[in-house]
Amino acid sequence: KISDCKIHDVGQDGILFVSCGNYKTLSPSNIVVSNNDIYNFARLERSYKTGIDFGYRCVGATAANNHIHNGPHAGMIFYGVNNDIYGNEFDNLVTEFSDMDALYCNNSNYPWERGNKIHNNYFHDIGKSSMNGRHQINVRAIRTDNRGCGLNIYENLFYNIGDGGNGNGNNGIGAITAEGTRNRIFNNLFVDCNEAYFNTLQYKEIENADDGTLYPDTVINSSGVEVANTINGAKVADLKKQ
């Protein structure tokens, strides 16, 4: 547990976990990061260094009631299963880049990664930066990138997201982008946002299998290796069993 800390003016991540729980057995990490003030991070390495990074394929971690602010790239990154992110405040993030988000997750071609919750957070003053006189593009408060599936995003407040379309349209700037399927987005409040919600079919949808279930269109998953070797893959009903 990391709680009640003030973390600031660090060269890379404010908090980084290399391993969070057991991905194959779904044994939770029980990591809790709470009540921290994290700001002015990524002072030396400016991209993909965040206030909180739960690491790759994390299981059962919690980020609660933290204030993450004043960062050049993402405020928080997570991947995995059964993570809970609530009561946090995110602001003045992604100040030096485009195509990044305050809270970024990438389930990518892992559609059995379910049970993640993002709720009761406050996102504000994001996507308003000008880089060498050019407006940002493709910046969101929350993004489930590359076909992220099965996330629950609810009861969050989004305020002052974007520059009011002063660039080219909304510049791809807004509150939520959910690029996959089976994402539940409800009871959120959007105030003064360029755009509230966007879903894209830019990435190939999960394909139907012969037995009426679904499977991802990647070599690793078509072979059944990942699905067969994770409890979550075995128990998710809409995925093909190899």
Locations of regions flagged by a protein language model:
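Sequence context of c-type cytochrome heme-c attachment sites
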Residues: N106
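Flexible, surface-exposed loop regions and adjacent strand-edge segments
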Residues: K204-I206
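Asp-box/WD-like beta-propeller blade repeats and closely related beta-sheet repeat scaffolds
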Residues: C20-G21
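Right-handed parallel beta-helix
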Residues: K1-Q12, L26-A42, V59-P72, V81-T95, ...
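Short glycine/acidic-rich loop motifs that flank beta-strands on beta-rich extracellular proteins
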Residues: G11-F17, L26, A42-T50, P72-Y79, ...
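C-terminal low-complexity, glycine/proline- and small-hydrophobic-enriched intrinsically disordered tails
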Residues: T230-K240
